[in-house]
């Protein structure tokens, strides 16, 4: 797992990728009371620009965040000045306090190729999650990820951004982002992810002690199927 460049963080924030945490946050705030659960605080792993933290804090859940990319955390601190944000590696991260709710969205777990490292993340989360607390995250669905046609858009009179997702291997995904200034390539970044077997992920959770584990293509029954699996797990009381 590698930190995003500052240029990519800026493109991410300006392009509109914040829509995903916005939709997820709205659904999460409906999902929580259906579990009879009212968390007082939350930690968002791989929080990106802090949008989910802002939504949770708007619902009086004291949400903090962490991300590997300094550029993402700089934007998160601007978006949520009252929150606490750390620049850290999710594999080894220990926040130094306990939380009722832990989230990890935007298929961040797919950025971790080794299942042994995923297991370490789950072990750490179990340790700083309060008894009875929930861990809610997502992973990409194999059937929903395929080679795509390039997509591009003008972000200013002189700048154009180009995207393409490809499957270079059976369980591999690559997202290529290019930025052109006045028609000349000025930046390129490739984001590589690994498609994980959801059953294997659920077994890892169980191995760490989590219970009430669910895996579904929709967080709410009434919402349409997503391109990700939503996985929820609870720490025993």
Predicted regions and their residues:
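Conserved class I S-adenosyl-L-methionine
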Residues: 1-38
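Class I SAM-dependent methyltransferase SAM/SAH-binding core
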Residues: 43, 50-92
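Conserved SAM-binding loop
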Residues: 70-71, 109-115, 120
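A short acidic, Gly/Pro-enriched loop at the edge of an enzyme's catalytic core
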Residues: 94-101
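Residues lining the SAM
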Residues: 105-107
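C-terminal lobe and adjacent flexible extensions of AdoMet/dcAdoMet transferase-like proteins
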Residues: 200-237
């Amino acid at each position: 797992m590698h930190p995003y460049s500052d240029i990519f963080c800026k493109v991410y924030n300006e392009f509109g990728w914040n829509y995903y945490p916005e939709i997820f946050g709205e659904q999460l705030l409906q999902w929580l009371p259906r579990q009879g659960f009212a968390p007082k605080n939350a930690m968002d792993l791989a929080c990106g620009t802090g949008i989910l933290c802002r939504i949770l804090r708007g619902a009086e859940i004291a949400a903090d965040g962490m991300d590997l990319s300094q550029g993402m955390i700089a934007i998160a601190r601007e978006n949520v000045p009252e929150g606490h944000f750390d620049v850290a590696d999710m594999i080894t991260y220990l926040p130094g306090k306990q939380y009722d709710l832990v989230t990890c969205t935007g298929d961040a777990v797919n950025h971790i190729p080794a299942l042994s490292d995923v297991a370490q993340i789950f072990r750490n989360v179990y340790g700083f999650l309060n008894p009875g607390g929930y861990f809610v995250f997502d992973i990409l669905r194999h059937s929903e990820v395929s080679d795509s046609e390039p997509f591009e858009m003008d972000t200013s009179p002189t700048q154009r951004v180009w995207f393409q997702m490809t499957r270079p291997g059976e369980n591999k995904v690559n997202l290529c982002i290019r930025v052109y200034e006045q028609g000349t390539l000025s930046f390129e970044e490739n984001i590589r992810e690994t498609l994980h077997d959801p059953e294997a992920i659920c077994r890892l959770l169980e191995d760490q002690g989590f219970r009430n584990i669910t895996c579904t293509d929709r967080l709410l029954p009434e919402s349409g199927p997503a391109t990700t699996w939503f996985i929820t797990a609870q720490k025993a009381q």
